[in-house]
Amino acid sequence: MTTNKKDDKITKIDINTNIDITDFIDTKYKSYVFYVLENRALPRLTDGLKTTSRKILNATFKGSLKNGEQKKLLNLAGDTMNLSLYAHGDSSLNSGIATLCQPFSFLFHPLYSDGQVGSLRDPKAAASPRYLTVKQSKYADLWKTDYDLLRFEEDEGQIVE
């Protein structure tokens, strides 16, 4: 299934229907590529965050990590999936949380972990998520988003960013 953001219609392709490959690339694939570029791959100008990072921080500010409490990274990932309707794999979400904990990835990193979240040499070499605990860093309040700047949509009957 692909979506076309211009008219917000979902186009279903039946597997039994023959489609010309040039027509498919010119219409469906191009709309998918532009959707990924606009909504997932590039950081937004409003806050400099990609969608995954924004959803993680949104979950922490909605109450998942209030008052300096500490949580297992897997629990924060579950809260993010629940509160922000994160529909992609949990491994990419775990990697995104570990990236937000890395002091070398952000000038003011929003989350803190006292475990191994990667290094400059290998930023993806974080410890297993079940061993990592995370909490909001002292810079977390700097990352609170001005919600008037964001576009909200309805997904599964819930309003999400």
Give residue ranges: language-model regions.
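Catalytic phosphate-handling regions of large nucleic-acid enzymes and associated NTPases
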Residues: M1-E161
